[in-house]
Amino acid sequence: MDIKEALNRIVGQLDLTTEEMQAVMRQIMTGQCTDAQVGAFLMGMRMKSETIDEIVGAVQVMRELAAPVRFDTDKLVDTCGTGGDGMNIFNVSTAASFVVAAAGGKVAKHGNRAVSGKSGSADLLEAAGVFLDLTPEQVARSVDTVGVGFMFAPAHHGAMKYAAGPRRELGLRTLFNILGPMANPAGVRHQVLGVFSKALCRPMAEVLSRLGSKHVLVVHAQDGLDEISLAAPTHVAELKDGEIREYSIQPEDFGIKSQSLIGLNVEDAQGSLALIRDALGRRKSENGQKAADMIVLNAGAALYAADVATTLKQGVEMAHDALCSGIARDKLEELVSFTAVFKQENQK
């Protein structure tokens, strides 16, 4: 099937099979389609709504064409969201990565610059001084030594360049917002995945189950956030041992007070970084303490997904201790220093 046939199908509200989606994605990601065709396909898929079969096929092609990062362990965890929630909250999942590492987890973080928001994970880390242009081997060394490694999506998904223009020009969430978090080049099988709609929670868990994931929490908060929220109940679809169960959680379940998100919005990466440094440090401001509470909730979920903690509650307790110890703040600075060495190596 070529993209013209696919466009005719989706305009008629007809779904593609997994194999048909794979064929179209290979055409897109090998530069065989025009920008107009790619843009039309992305908008058509959004208007039709992507099926599990379609998403599975698309992720398989992204993984197939990615530059892999190889590890000796399968206990790696990723924390990321689809974006597109329109909330412009600070980079919660990226901040949570340092708390997870401080508590003994290993984070293979996969991310990009902002598409529809104010600050993507790459924007934040770059603002902090983290060198992003790492080889796969350097990412692996970073995870082994620091506990956190960042895989800049464009460096590992070179074929994505063929969709970058249409995505940027559309400025809306598209199929790729859904695909990106599931196309981690390290092949992580433990994950906290935030999604922009409750309706996506179970389908994404089913997709990841078909793709071989072991323990995943797919989350969407009642206030619209693609993270575990401090301000509202969060719906969770948990994949564990091949079974999916759904439930709702709220901050009080973990001894944390529900609070509004006012003060957690940021205008850019520098604003996000300042709030995160306060949250991971001495929490001098009310917003810093509030951000810390939200980071702890999300880091706790990642520790549970990574099987470092045996329950979600234990994960949150471990995250709280790691943040309050100051080790999480040190992990951020350690990553900056560690990647600076790679920058010097790569410039020789």
From Swiss-Prot:
Pathway where it operates: Amino-acid biosynthesis; L-tryptophan biosynthesis; L-tryptophan from chorismate: step 2/5
InterPro entries: Anthranilate_Pribosyl_Tfrase (IPR005940), Glycosyl_Trfase_fam3 (IPR000312), Glycosyl_Trfase_fam3_N_dom (IPR017459), Glycosyl_Trfase_fam3_N_dom_sf (IPR036320), Nuc_phospho_transferase (IPR035902)
Molecular function GO labels: anthranilate phosphoribosyltransferase activity; magnesium ion binding
Keyword Disulfide bond annotated: no
Gene Ontology biological process terms in this record: L-tryptophan biosynthetic process
Residues annotated as binding Mg(2+) 1: S93, E227
Cofactor note: Binds 2 magnesium ions per monomer.
Catalytic activity: N-(5-phospho-beta-D-ribosyl)anthranilate + diphosphate = 5-phospho-alpha-D-ribose 1-diphosphate + anthranilate
Chain residues that bind 5-phospho-alpha-D-ribose 1-diphosphate: 81, 84-85, 91-94, 109-117, 121
Binding site for anthranilate 1: G81, N112
SUPFAM superfamilies: Nucleoside phosphorylase/phosphoribosyltransferase catalytic domain, Nucleoside phosphorylase/phosphoribosyltransferase N-terminal domain
Residues that, per the record, bind Mg(2+) 2: D226, E227
Record-listed anthranilate 2 binding positions: R167
Top-rank taxon: Bacteria
Protein EC: 2.4.2.18
A GO term from the CC aspect: cytosol
Assembly information from the UniProt record: Homodimer.
Biological role stated in the UniProt entry: Catalyzes the transfer of the phosphoribosyl group of 5-phosphorylribose-1-pyrophosphate (PRPP) to anthranilate to yield N-(5'-phosphoribosyl)-anthranilate (PRA).
Protein name as catalogued: Anthranilate phosphoribosyltransferase
Native organism taxonomy: Bacteria, Pseudomonadati, Pseudomonadota, Gammaproteobacteria, Pseudomonadales
